Amino acid sequence: MKKMNLVTAALPYVNNIPHLGNLVQVLSADAFARYSKMSGIETLYVCGTDEYGTATETKALIENTTPLELCNKYYEIHKSIYKWFNIEFDIFGRTTNKNHQDIVQNFFLQLEKNGYIKERETEQFYCNKDSMFLADRYVIGECPECQSMAKGDQCDNCSKLLNPTDLINPKCIICKNKPILKKTNHLYLDLPKIKTKLEKWIKNPDTSKNWNTNALKMTKAFLRDGLKERAITRDLKWGIPVPKKGFENKVFYVWFDAPIGYISITKNIIKNWESWWKNNDQVNLVQFIGKDNILFHTIIFPCIEIGSEENWTILNQLSSSEYLNYENLKFSKSEGTGIFGNDAITTGIPSDIWRFYIYYNRPEKSDFQFMWQDLMERVNTELIDNFSNLVNRVLTFQRKFFGDVIETIEIQNKFWKQITPKYNKILNLFKKTELKSALKEILKISSLGNKIFQDNEPWKRKNNSPQETKELISNLIYLIRDLSILMMPFIPETSKKIQQFFGNSYQFSTKILGTKSGIKKIEFTEILFNKLEQKKINNLKLKYSGDKNMKENEQAENLPIAKEQPENLFREKVLLRVVKINKIERNPEAKNLFILKLDDGTNKDKQIVSGLEGYYTEEELLGKHIIIVDNLKPAKFRGIKSEGMLIAAEDKNKNFKVIIVEDSIQNPIAGERIILENDQNKDLACPPKIDINKFLKANIVAENGELKINGINLILENSKNKILSKDIPNGTVC
């Protein structure tokens, strides 16, 4: 059993001020690290700023400064914001530290030595005026999708992922002249060559069992569709130099060097860094990331470590979260919309309130919209009327009627039988990084404490049954002490204040939960929080809503907040069709990839690429009807275009089977759409192109041999026959 917890949060990019959504990862890792330390586990929480790459170089140009000066500026801004939010890093460093270059270059040399690096000639935009190759963010132009101005990697308006060559009327961001395409050489990490070792690691029972569902589904879908070689070099100046002849003027792509930053940042601060990073048998690596970073942490970084063929500590526990958004608007400093870290400091709202609200709504399984009205309601009802109220009413009652001294108490077994079983449940939720659920379970205990106080009516019984009333209040005081321990990972300043009421040195250990000794006296009390007022919230909402006037804000405030249910997402975003496999070919570049030639009812050949080697032979699939995600954005796998993705079911024992629509039972028609059972006879729109993450959010499951979403059957649109999963009766669909 592993004895040490190495905790990391995704390294924030250091060319901007972090907003509330950016803070989710560092706050999540902070809560887990605090829990781990309270549990007596040796713990190291590592984070730092990701400083190299195109975004930094271009931002430095805009601010008329050097990349390093820009990083120095924003590093201090990040540090001050994290300090105000009371994020307790053990190490908070930078990827521009003195060890980073050596470690990154050493990883590269090991990968090259072991045969995992390839060289390839490509075409890239080149600016004749500035005499330089242009990385993606150095190119701007018109988005082909929405015609807005966009950078060469992604359109900020419609979120479409782009290559610089996709842009209409591309221009150099520096001189605004039109670039030309020019050949250049780059180095690639040969992910397909590492794939077998990677899959063996992922299939190990001790690996992915500790990953959350979305991360695991996305990783498996990515693997199934085949890994591609990935460029690791760029034509930039700001970055780690490539230690290879002929590549002296190139640097490593930031995605290659950034995850290695966890290691270099640790080495830069502590001497025994190898006891953490080269100790896979003893160290549990727990990583907190956003959904946009999943593949970098489940595929790219592990491949770098595995390919080096050294005993690196590798990912064991992964907690990925969805997006925290703002009032149906985008976080934008320039437009004045959204709360950024420095804004939170000036609102006059304490950091523990911000922490509480972010944890309470941590986007663990779906995106969450920050709403000012919801902030006020959740804080006033759950944090103040529930938790803070229990602390105040119990301690005030004790001091008013029984004095400051806490007498030795008689244990009320009936009281504690309601409470103590819940402690283990909460600690287990912490262990599994289900932080939102842990917080809500703690609040349930607080609510139960209020109910016990109310039901026993101590204000009535204190005269007729003074001893019993004393015992009740004393037991409630120890409950408050326990709640201060459990709430410590979420609201540390408030938890410390509660323990100061008892005059003790801080006792933040899970080992004393449920014990009934150690509190002698109440030294002082005070109100923990003041309620948030509607007027203040209205003013803050207006202030951080950009150019919208108060009327628009009030209208938005009255709109119902509709959570995107999986069945609604499926109906509006996902297009499943039945297709018939007419022909199967092998990719000459990757024998594990099947190229499936499909009949989709349009009399045009359609093809998808899927990694089915080891699962099926060609004979088992040829002529079968299967289901594909028909509106998935096209992709290339080892040079072969794939126009969709087949769907399959997987059970808890990792058994994997393609969903096959039986001719004799279900009477499928090639091209027939798959719909929800309650959408029969409806005129359904054809949804837009989506990425794989959007499909996975539909949460299709196999349940008792039938495919369902939220309990609703999927059926064939024409025959109305249910979609079956005979081989995997119960499992997830990916």
Curated annotation (Swiss-Prot):
It is an enzyme of class 6 (ligase). A motif ('KMSKS' region) lies at residues 330-334. InterPro entries: aa-tRNA-synth_I_CS (IPR001412), Anticodon_Met (IPR041872), Met-tRNA-synth_bsu_C (IPR004495), Met-tRNA_ligase_1 (IPR023458), Met-tRNA_synth (IPR014758), Methionyl/Leucyl_tRNA_Synth (IPR015413), MetRS_core (IPR033911), MetRS_Zn (IPR029038). Its main location: cytoplasm. Its EC number is 6.1.1.10. Residues 570-675 form the tRNA-binding domain. One of its GO terms (cellular component) is cytosol. It catalyses: tRNA(Met) + L-methionine + ATP = L-methionyl-tRNA(Met) + AMP + diphosphate. Binds 1 zinc ion per subunit. It comes from the Bacteria. A motif ('HIGH' region) lies at residues 12-22. Its cofactor is Zn(2+). Zn(2+) binds at C143, C146, C155, C158. Disulfide bonds: none annotated. GO terms for molecular function: ATP binding; metal ion binding; methionine-tRNA ligase activity; tRNA binding. GO terms for biological process: methionyl-tRNA aminoacylation. Gene3D superfamilies: HUPs, Isoleucyl-tRNA Synthetase, Domain 1, Methionyl-tRNA synthetase, Zn-domain, Nucleic acid-binding proteins. Keywords: Aminoacyl-tRNA synthetase, ATP-binding, Cytoplasm, Ligase, Metal-binding, Nucleotide-binding, Protein biosynthesis, RNA-binding, tRNA-binding, Zinc. Belongs to the class-I aminoacyl-tRNA synthetase family. MetG type 1 subfamily. Homodimer. NCBIfam families: metG (TIGR00398), metG_C_term (TIGR00399), PRK00133.1 (NF001100). This is Methionine--tRNA ligase. The lineage of its organism: Bacteria, Pseudomonadati, Spirochaetota, Spirochaetia, Spirochaetales.
